[in-house]
């Protein structure tokens, strides 16, 4: 299952155009985190030709964007964050059309999009499992929000179709399933619970002696475990 997650969207019209293109590709779960205006629905729905009313819409609000985003993603297994800018992050990064080996229809997946003006912050990106980008003109790479959602939705629907074809036509050797396919991938909420507990235990043992490096060290540890694709068990 796929969810589209919009973080701090600025314009109701953009939300509406996103809803319309989602319905074009039969994607029904839209999560909006801290929209700029709470009264976006009527304008967005009109812009979407009433597609918004046909989606499963969730709006998450909190004065702390990190808390709001963690709540929005708590049941997601794989978070794919879209950005056009190079970042100083150690996460796996690839073009949207190369995501086939990283996404499974049996898991909860999400495409994460930042606000129209500034995109995703590094703190918001830290909750993602993967960084993805669209192979566009390097001299003019930024698509508008609905265009970006449209490209990602198309690639996902194409991948979903190909996976279905392969499932029906290709014999699968169940004796050789790898660990990440035979066990459920941990959700964002489960990962966060594990990391919070780990950091508490490390602090109690005096691991973070240099307080000036604590945040950086925690970030590096978090990146290591996110790359490991932890399972629920």
What is each of the regions a protein language model found here?
Residues 1-233:
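Post-transcriptional modification and biogenesis factors for structured RNAs
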């Amino acid at each position: 299952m796929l969810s589209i997650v919009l973080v701090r969207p600025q314009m109701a019209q953009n939300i509406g155009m996103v809803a319309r293109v989602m319905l074009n590709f039969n994607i029904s779960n839209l999560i909006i985190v801290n929209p700029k205006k709470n009264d976006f629905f009527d304008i967005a729905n009109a812009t979407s030709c009433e597609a918004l009313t046909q989606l499963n819409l969730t709006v998450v609000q909190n004065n702390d964007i990190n808390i709001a985003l963690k709540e929005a993603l708590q049941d997601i297994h794989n978070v794919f964050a879209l950005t056009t800018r190079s970042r100083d992050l150690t996460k796996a990064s690839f073009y949207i059309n190369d995501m086939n080996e990283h996404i499974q229809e049996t898991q909860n997946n999400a495409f994460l999009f930042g606000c129209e003006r500034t995109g995703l912050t590094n703190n918001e990106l830290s909750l993602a499992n993967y960084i993805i980008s669209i192979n566009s003109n390097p001299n003019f790479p930024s698509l508008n929000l609905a265009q970006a959602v449209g490209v990602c939705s198309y690639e996902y629907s194409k991948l979903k179709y190909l996976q279905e074809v392969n499932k029906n036509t290709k014999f699968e050797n169940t004796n050789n399933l790898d660990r990440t396919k035979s066990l459920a991938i941990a959700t964002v909420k489960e990962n966060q619970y594990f990391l919070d507990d780990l950091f508490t235990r490390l602090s109690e043992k005096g691991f973070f002696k240099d307080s000036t490096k604590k945040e950086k060290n925690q970030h590096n540890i978090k990146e290591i475990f996110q790359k490991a694709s932890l399972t629920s068990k």
